[in-house]
């Protein structure tokens, strides 16, 4: 019988140690760019389905390139149906970044879509890269997906800042990420990332 091994998250391991990882944002679809980033020493690459015209096959190739070099892949998803959230994970991304989260109810809905039982109601397949094409035992697949896959929420508006503590308290969330571009836009100062209101929110 084959001994199927799962890959732990580098970023999550660093989180648990209280240290900071390096993440490189990549807007190019060529998987060789991912390999170059990995060889430069980063811990993870950040790919984007919100603003970048990635297709699913191309994204899968980028994730595979990262996996070859043992670095994490974080995919910023499009806001949409549950499949927009789980397909990067099924392609074996290490985690997702969900933009424009404003309330704890939204955060709980995201967890429900992305986590498996007993933490959520994610649709169960296992026949993709993250389940090693049905070679990974189902209990190990569920455990690994729940424990080693990240959910990071972007805080990008004054409304989200008002609800920050409630959002952060939702079980199943691994981290919050501030979005200065949209935050500056929402306060009527688009692109002014260094003004006091944005700087204070970033803290």
Question: Each predicted region: which residue ranges?
Answer:
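Conserved anion-binding
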Residues: 83, 95-171, 185
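Short, well-ordered coil/turn segments that N-cap beta-strands
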Residues: 17-22, 42-43, 67-73, 93-94, ...
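Glycine-rich, proline-tolerant flexible connector loops at the mouths of alpha/beta enzymes
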Residues: 33-61, 181-196
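Conserved, mostly hydrophobic/aromatic
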Residues: 24, 37, 48, 96, ...
């Amino acid at each position: 019988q084959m001994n199927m091994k799962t890959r732990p998250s580098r970023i999550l391991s660093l989180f648990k140690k209280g240290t900071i990882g390096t993440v490189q944002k990549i807007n190019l679809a060529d998987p060789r760019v991912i390999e170059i980033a990995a060889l430069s020493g980063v811990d993870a690459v950040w790919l984007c389905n919100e603003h970048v015209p990635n297709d699913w096959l191309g994204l899968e190739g980028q994730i595979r390139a990262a996996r070859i070099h043992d670095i994490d892949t974080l995919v910023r998803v499009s806001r949409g149906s549950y499949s927009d959230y789980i397909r990067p994970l099924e392609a074996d991304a290490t985690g997702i970044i969900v933009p424009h989260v404003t309330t704890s109810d939204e955060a709980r809905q995201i967890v429900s879509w992305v986590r498996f039982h007993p933490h959520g109601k994610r649709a169960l397949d296992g026949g993709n890269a993250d389940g090693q094409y049905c070679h990974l035992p189902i209990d190990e697949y569920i455990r690994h997906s729940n424990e080693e896959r990240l959910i990071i929420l972007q805080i990008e508006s004054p409304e989200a800042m008002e609800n920050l503590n409630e959002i952060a308290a939702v079980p199943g969330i691994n981290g919050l990420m501030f979005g200065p571009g949209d935050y500056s836009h929402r306060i009527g100062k688009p692109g002014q990332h260094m003004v006091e209101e944005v700087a204070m929110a970033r803290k």
